[in-house]
């Protein structure tokens, strides 16, 4: 005979209800915690802007540095446009080429206004380990503490750096394509900026990171074409800027590791590409792909005032250089997209470098391009030569894409370069 269970007493019923409510609350708490944890996991630090550090060159080089040899008790304010936005920011200052410690007295950041101004409500003090300043060892970077500042995609930040001591400007980026201001005293928290002088180079500031939901990073590497030498100053019209706009909806950051004067095989206006890939490229968190556009200066500098004593490389020399870059990418499990070299007939004519172009140099460029197209050495290619050349005169840039010096694309040429990149091919999707 099976006995029916005895009915619960009122006290037992109350206890059971309390237990069920507790279980439900615990389950809800665990579920909410899981959601919160999942949300937190979506947020990560990613580089949203960079400028590759360069060493100062000797005064006898053909190009001026455009910056003073040193500053003391001055603030430098620099504007950067980020690719991705976020709710927290870190700044990176570089003493890569300093031979003595760099004393940072103070730093500040905020959303940029006009002519060096900062939106007052967004001004933030930058700290390093909780301190206003820091002593940066030679060769080292200084990474700031995270700071709360909501930054939108494609937003502009004004970064202010106060240098209280006599400070040689040993680490810089020559072709910033953005006005920077010098002012006396500590102006890191000032809304407006009382400038004593300006430049379009960058000093010490090498990277901005944001904490945000992101799907990784694309880095473009190259010379002055990538650095934006033909782009309008203060307009953010480098080809990487247009590419960043295309990738922003996918939450993918774009970093520009171009250096004007950069070369594949030699140093001068910065170290050669292979020597800086680990620092500028492979160290980036969430790296998805790299676009490489380099080699025209290797071909064209020899015999000019830039490299009078150097011999022009052979095709085998160039191929070996590319293969070393490819080998580094493979070792770091990074997708590498090779770009063909654009046409340059008539480049820099009427300047002290009017011998930059020569038919023999152009013949080598075309051989290099043939290898890039046909070797299958890269994971993919983008044919900038085909995009930018004049159909009626293939050795020259399309006039509408030419900045005017017949070497560097202008704003519309840069837009055409970015628009020609198949994003699926770029990312290997």
Where are the model-predicted features located?
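Bacterial N-terminal signal peptides that target proteins for export
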Residues: 2-25
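Structural recognition of the beta-strand scaffold that forms the well-ordered cores
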Residues: 90, 217-222, 226, 253-258, ...
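Solvent-exposed loop/turn segments at secondary-structure junctions
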Residues: 97, 165-166, 224-228, 259-265, ...
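Catalytic His-Asp segment of secreted/periplasmic serine-dependent ester chemistry enzymes
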Residues: 274, 300-302, 342-429
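Surface-exposed amphipathic alpha-helices with a cationic face
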Residues: 322-330
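N-terminal secretory targeting modules
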Residues: 38-221, 228-234, 429
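Oxyanion-hole/transition-state-stabilizing segment in secreted/luminal serine hydrolases
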Residues: 231, 259, 263-317
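Bacterial N-terminal signal peptides
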Residues: 23-34
């Amino acid at each position: 005979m099976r006995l029916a269970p005895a009915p619960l007493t009122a006290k037992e019923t109350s206890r059971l209800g309390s237990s069920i409510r507790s279980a439900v609350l615990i389950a809800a708490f665990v579920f909410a915690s899981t959601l919160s944890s999942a949300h937190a996991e979506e947020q990560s630090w990613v580089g949203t802007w960079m400028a590759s550090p360069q060493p100062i060159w000797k005064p006898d080089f053909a190009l001026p540095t455009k910056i003073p040899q040193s500053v003391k008790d001055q603030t430098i304010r620099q504007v950067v446009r980020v690719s991705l936005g976020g709710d927290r920011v870190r700044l990176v200052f570089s003493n890569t080429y300093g031979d003595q410690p760099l004393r940072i007295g103070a730093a500040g950041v905020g959303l940029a206004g006009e002519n060096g101004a900062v939106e007052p409500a967004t001004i933030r003090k930058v700290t390093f380990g909780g301190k206003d300043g820091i002593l940066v060892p030679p060769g080292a970077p200084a990474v700031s503490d995270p700071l709360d500042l909501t930054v939108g995609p494609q937003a502009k930040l004004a970064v202010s750096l106060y240098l209280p001591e006599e400070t040689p400007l040993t680490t810089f980026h020559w072709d910033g394509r953005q006005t920077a201001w010098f002012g006396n005293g500590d102006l890191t928290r000032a809304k407006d900026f009382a400038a004593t002088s300006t430049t379009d180079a960058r000093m010490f500031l090498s990277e901005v990171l944001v904490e945000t939901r992101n799907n990784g990073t694309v880095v473009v590497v190259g010379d002055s074409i990538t650095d934006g030498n033909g782009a309008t100053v203060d307009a953010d019209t480098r080809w990487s800027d247009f590419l960043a706009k295309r990738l922003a909806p996918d939450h993918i950051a774009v970093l520009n590791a171009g250096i004007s004067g950069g070369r594949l095989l030699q140093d001068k206006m910065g170290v050669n590409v292979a020597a800086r890939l680990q620092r500028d490229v492979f160290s980036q968190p969430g790296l998805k792909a790299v676009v490489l556009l380099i080699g025209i200066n290797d071909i064209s500098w020899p015999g000019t005032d830039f490299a009078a004593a150097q011999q022009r490389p052979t095709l085998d020399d160039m191929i070996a250089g590319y293969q070393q870059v490819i080998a580094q990418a493979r070792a770091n499990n990074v997708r590498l997209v090779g770009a063909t070299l654009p046409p340059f007939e008539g480049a820099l004519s009427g300047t002290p470098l009017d011998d930059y172009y020569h038919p023999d140099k152009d013949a080598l460029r075309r051989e290099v391009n043939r290898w890039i197209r046909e070797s299958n050495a890269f994971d993919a290619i983008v044919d900038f030569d085909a995009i930018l050349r004049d159909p009626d005169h293939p050795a020259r840039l399309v006039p509408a894409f030419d900045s005017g010096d017949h070497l560097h694309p202008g704003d519309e040429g840069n837009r055409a370069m970015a628009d020609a990149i198949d994003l699926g091919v770029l990312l290997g999707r």
